[in-house]
Amino acid sequence: MSQQVIIFDTTLRDGEQALQASLSVKEKLQIALALERMGVDVMEVGFPVSSPGDFESVQTIARTIKNSRVCALARCVEKDIDVAAESLKVAEAFRIHTFIATSPMHIATKLRSTLDEVIERAIYMVKRARNYTDDVEFSCEDAGRTPIADLARVVEAAINAGATTINIPDTVGYTMPFEYANIISGLYDRVPNIDKAIISVHTHDDLGIAVGNALAAVHAGARQVEGAMNGIGERAGNCALEEVIMAIKVRKDIMNVHTNINHHEIWRTSQTVSQICNMPIPANKAIVGTGAFAHSSGIHQDGVLKNRENYEIMTPESIGLNQVQLNLTSRSGRAAVKHRMEEMGYQESDYNLDHLYDAFLKLADKKGQVFDYDLEALAFINKQQEEPEHFRLDYFNVQSGSSDIATASIKLVCGDEIKTEAANGNGPVDAIYQAINRVTDYNIELVKYGLSAKGHGKDALGQVDIVVDYNGRRFHGVGLATDIVESSAKAMVHVLNNIWRAAEVEKELQRKAQNKENNKETV
């Protein structure tokens, strides 16, 4: 009977560190719910001590998630562990993940300490974490460059202190697969109490072998793999979880292990992470790239037509990618739209049917037929923009030509006021952004502008993703329409609402902090 490999997702912690703009609490929760649907065993959702915002997002996710274990990161520092526990205590089940560096380089130059002191600190902090939960993970940072004898000493001590999972990370993506496998098997040979903990691996893709390293470690005995969806993360990224999951499934003949992942949710979860994080998936990306199941060679096409297994080691359907696209029209009713969403795997809680159907009718009137990919794009946008809006685009008009200066006029709803403005710009998009900036008086700098087609052909929806800098913080906005100028305007209005909401959250956090101080003074 095969053993289970625990899937530990760190998209919302290690993965988020690679993003140009921080995610809102709502966006993080959206990803967490997608990961829960996919069936991840553990999700690491933040570093609570780092900021009040991160604390709030961890707490919100911990309160909401019911079927996955929620985890938070903490250094081997008392305050880190205490704050992590405070943010997680509302969860059905939670884990505290604490870490300290173990390689000679990190100990000498970063910690300015000794191995004995590191071991002593690790023991104390694992025991402290165990006061809050019986599920404690301990990581030996830079384990890939730690001598095996030193590593074995740390691991044995951490297990004796109460760690239930021991993580052996290749922090800088330096280790080769055969070396990594030797580290794992070496620990099994050297650590007498290793049977009392689950051995985990966390790999980075600096040399392009994060997935290979993780699989080699599993083959050598590791029973937890840490990574992020689509491989997002610092530098070259983390181990791509969807690749590990499908490799274990497809090559079960030699891996002799399994995961409890619902692999039919992989495609949708991957798309959710890509869209919310504003990180497009390369067409040739394994498992989830648009070309992953494409065949252009005549020989390959002929072979696939005769038998798909000639050139496909897995099917698109196995990851939840439905290649049969059905279309709806403006004559399709709400029930038809709801039924199609259910067929694509969406639950009622994933979208607001009233808002989705209104957007569907507007799109159907414009382009006639609405396909599955249109519905998915509309559902995503409506989910992103379902929160109360302070700003709303009421009207816009743009005049532009090859020999004319682009001019835009807008009418923007700002709370209880309606404001109008006009401006010139270097093209229609710049003109409309200049007009919006005049209305709001926000000092916004556009950092990134991206346009992608959602669908096929000349009537495809155009999705605009932008990143702006406002007062030293990055914010992401997204807009969707058949007209790219309209998409661009909607993306900027989405950014304005995100900035406004962030300010409101900051005010609320300050209010709570002040109330806490007032209560202390009263006591």
UniProtKB/Swiss-Prot annotation:
Give coiled-coil spans as residue ranges: none
GO-annotated molecular function: 2-isopropylmalate synthase activity; acetyl-CoA C-acetyltransferase activity; manganese ion binding
Q: Record's InterPro entries?
A: 2-IPM_HCS-like, 2-isopropylmalate_synth_dimer, AIPM/Hcit_synth_CS, Aldolase_TIM, LeuA/HCS_post-cat, LeuA_allosteric_dom_sf, LeuA_bact_synth, PYR_CT
Q: Which residues cross the membrane?
A: none
The record's SUPFAM superfamilies line, in alphabetical order, gives: 2-isopropylmalate synthase LeuA, allosteric (dimerisation) domain, Aldolase
Q: Which UniProt keywords apply?
A: Amino-acid biosynthesis, Branched-chain amino acid biosynthesis, Cytoplasm, Leucine biosynthesis, Manganese, Metal-binding, Transferase
Q: Where in the cell is it found?
A: Cytoplasm
GO cellular component labels: cytosol
Query: What are the required cofactors?
Result: Mn(2+)
The record places domain Pyruvate carboxyltransferase at 5-267
Family, per the entry? Answer: Belongs to the alpha-IPM synthase/homocitrate synthase family. LeuA type 1 subfamily.
According to its UniProt entry, the function of this protein is described as:
Catalyzes the condensation of the acetyl group of acetyl-CoA with 3-methyl-2-oxobutanoate (2-ketoisovalerate) to form 3-carboxy-3-hydroxy-4-methylpentanoate (2-isopropylmalate).
Q: How does it assemble?
A: Homodimer.
Q: What is this protein called?
A: 2-isopropylmalate synthase
- Organism of derivation: Klebsiella pneumoniae subsp. pneumoniae (strain ATCC 700721 / MGH 78578)
Q: Which gene encodes it?
A: leuA
